[in-house]
Regions:
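N-terminal "arm"/small-domain region of PLP-dependent enzymes with the aminotransferase-like
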Residues: 1-22, 354-355
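Phosphate-binding glycine-rich loop
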Residues: 22-69, 82-86, 92, 159
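PLP-dependent aminotransferase class I/II
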Residues: 30-34, 42-45, 105, 117-121, ...
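PLP-dependent aminotransferase-like
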Residues: 60-139, 143-148, 155
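Conserved active-site segment immediately N-terminal to the catalytic lysine
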Residues: 146-178, 205-208
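Active-site PLP attachment segment
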Residues: 163-198, 218-221
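Short capping segments at the starts of secondary-structure elements
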Residues: 401-409
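Charged low-complexity interaction tracts in eukaryotic proteins
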Residues: 423, 429-457
Length: 457
């Protein structure tokens, strides 16, 4: 958890006493913008209520709209959602297997006459190859946009992330490296782009362009001014914690530490490694069960699949069920997102092992490292206890065994019909995933969200 103290309280008190909670000339938002741009060595900093809202406004600021494409990476999908909000088609480029970051060679293959920009994610505080991506963007007359939500004060080849592209966006929600509750900041070194973004996020009675009201409040900025001073100290602790977690993999040949780009100083957000159990004959489910047995604290497989396989992207229903924006008459391309489009992402994402890398106490990192070491030992020795089935598990297995591959909603319908109780889709999917992923893995995948009975006995 972040630290909050006397300066945050004093700043918030000043806001309350001023009686002006937003748009205060010379107030905390003006100070926060100035301090942030100076800290990141950028010319302009534009504050918003959230980073996502700033991302929503950026395609319009660069002139992207109906008929255009923006190339994105598929491990997360926030930039792709921002594209759809602007009637822009996100086009998915693959990632590097060792870093999970956008692959410039894949980007080159995705560029068309419709491409307007490249939007790269610095996933979990690791810098993507923005020098190469900027070169590609310049060669093709494209904008380079950076999602730096996880990568505050991350340097790559001597320059802070966010400054390699035409825009860089940063998130200040409670789970980020500079928490203000909610909030975001965009940086740019281009006067025209700063003007275009500003007029899309704050307007009065007569806006000149399609705009909204995405202001940051004085309360958020007051906390941000104080928290910005704490960030270097936070990052020092996070980097030391990452080193402790990295060391826990010493001697393990089947969990690969994530590749760290040369000439960079990362800002750890999530720590991660990649599962290669086939090198030692260790099953994925066995590691998960071993981790639970040793105390847990790690997530397995992240979202399980790349963004383009999410239902919301596969169906053209961004605006009701009108077929927009994929079937827009201004769009001359074809949307056909299906498995196999980004093979590296599809292979890597389900094999990611990860945990939060933003604890402020060193003992928390040592505890996690010890649990991971113990899980590795249990998995290698085969000393893993099988998953203990609940009544819910037994009924799920019965339904799928008797009625064939099923999706969570289909299992819920059977439960309702049989009077076995009603469960929401999230809970049902979680239990079905556990039965697939934990020893003795009674289910297997039969589709993106479909499970089949898989008896290994």
């Amino acid at each position: 958890m972040p630290e909050f103290g006397k300066e945050e309280i004093a700043n918030l008190t000043k806001v309350v006493e001023s009686g002006v909670f937003c748009d205060k000339r010379g107030g905390f938002m003006d100070q926060f913008r100035a301090d942030f741009s100076q800290a990141l060595e950028a010319k302009h900093a534009i504050a918003g209520a959230t980073a996502m809202l700033l991302m929503h406004a950026i395609p319009g600021a660069i002139g992207a709209g109906a008929g255009d494409e923006i190339i994105v990476d598929p491990v997360v999908q926030f930039h792709a959602i921002a594209c759809l909000h602007n009637n822009v088609i996100p086009v998915w480029a693959d990632v590097r297997p060792e870093s999970f970051l956008m692959d410039p060679e894949s980007v080159k293959r995705k560029i068309t006459k419709r491409t307007k920009a490249i939007w790269v994610t610095h996933l979990w505080g690791f810098p993507a190859e923005v020098d190469t991506l900027r070169q590609i963007a310049d060669e093709h007359g494209l904008y380079l946009l950076e999602d730096c939500a996880h990568a505050l004060m991350t340097r790559y080849r001597g320059r802070y992330l966010g400054n390699w592209g035409h825009f860089g966006t940063f998130s200040f929600n409670m789970g980020k490296q500079l928490p203000t509750g909610e909030g975001g900041m965009a940086i740019t070194n281009d006067d025209r782009l700063a003007f275009e973004l500003n007029r899309r996020i704050i307007f009065g009675e007569s806006p000149e362009v399609l705009s909204s009201n995405y202001r940051m409040t004085e309360f958020q900025a007051a906390v941000g001014v104080a928290q910005l001073k704490r960030v270097p100290g936070y990052l020092e602790i996070f980097r030391a914690g990452k080193a402790i977690l990295d060391e826990s993999l010493a001697g393990c040949s089947w969990l690969d530490r994530r590749g760290e780009p040369p000439d960079s100083q990362i800002s750890p957000y999530f720590w991660s490694c990649l599962f290669h159990g086939e090198r030692r004959g260790v099953e994925w489910g066995v590691l998960r069960a071993a981790m639970e047995q040793s105390g847990g604290g790690f997530q397995f497989g992240f979202t399980q699949k790349p963004g383009y396989l999410y239902e919301m992207f596969r169906k053209p229903n961004a605006y009701g069920n009108k077929g927009c924006p994929y079937n827009c008459h201004l769009y001359t391309g074809k949307v056909d997102w299906r498995p196999g489009m980004c093979p590296v992402s599809e292979d890597v994402i389900p094999r990611i092992v990860m945990t939060n890398n933003m604890a402020l106490r060193e003992e928390e990192y040592h505890s996690k490292a010890a649990r991971l070491k113990e899980a590795i030992k249990l998995a290698e020795k085969g000393e893993v206890k099988p998953l203990e089935y609940t009544e819910l598990d037994r009924r799920i297995l019965k339904a799928i065994k008797e009625q064939g591959p099923l999706e969570p909603l289909e299992v819920i319908e059977i439960f309702d019909r049989e009077g076995w109780g009603h469960f929401d889709e999230h809970t049902m999917y979680g239990r079905m995933s556990a039965l697939r992923s934990y020893y003795p893995y009674k289910l297997s995948h039969a589709g993106p969200r479909k499970f089949a009975y898989h008896d290994l006995s």
